[in-house]
């Protein structure tokens, strides 16, 4: 597939910043090239040297874990950096548009607004699936990006895979962004495995959820190598700090924690759902393929405030279209989930 028409001409022609670590990649020698402090950092660990701008050690690990090649991986300061760079790479304000399918992750809209890009919204159906016909009717020659979040946030469900395939095969003027932030909690295979067949796909994932590394802010984009080269071309030169790279490398070297965490969260998700089903104030618990559930409650706003007073924090989604009177609940450890059930039971029995 020819990506050239999807990318803004000045991005193709851009001469990127060349950092000191781009020009010399060796680890041994006397380094007088980057204006670093030769005395160290004054800390136990030495952070005075700039980090690898392409994070190759981490990418080698991820290539094995994700069954892809190193040149198909981009690492960003959270997935939000990848979202922003993709928009700036493809969309010109006043010319191009993107398609969003609310309710969905809010940063797509925020990033588009910051970049002054037209947003066309095609709401999910009542069962939180894609309105394929509506999306296809909304696409025009200036549509550059279609954002799909699966499993979806804030609803928790995975999108029908057949619908995603239909859109990927029908959308000819831009990229389909598939946000898989919660894929580790789903039995659905990642679309990373489809990159060779569908080079117009960009898949996003994160280490913030299943890997428990939210504080480090490391997001991943997986795409055709030519797209990864462009993302690396326009990113800040050292967008992933050295401390983050070291910690992530250690975490990825011990995959058992992630696997055990996922199994525990899935088990607790099932247990919490069964407990909530017994409470009269619960109207509906929506299907979840994530580490959270969306629950439709009677008097959801009052319940949310009651939980806040008890210092149990959930996310009130009642103001979001199609999520009226609903609260998003992250799956906690067993004691936290038991406390939640106890408080909700007390609220509706009072």
Go through the PLM ranges and name each one:
Residues 1-64:
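N-terminal "arm"/small-domain region of PLP-dependent enzymes with the aminotransferase-like
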Residues 56-97, 115:
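Phosphate-binding glycine-rich loop
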Residues 200-278, 285:
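PLP-dependent aminotransferase class I/II
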Residues 265-266, 278-310:
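Conserved PLP-binding catalytic core of the aspartate aminotransferase-like
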Residues 92-148:
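PLP-dependent aminotransferase-like
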Residues 43, 299-306, 336-339:
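Short, conserved charged micro-motifs
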Residues 162, 309-310, 319-350:
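PLP-dependent enzyme catalytic core of the Aspartate aminotransferase-like
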Residues 113, 132-141, 154-176, 180-213:
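Active-site pre-lysine segment of PLP-dependent enzymes
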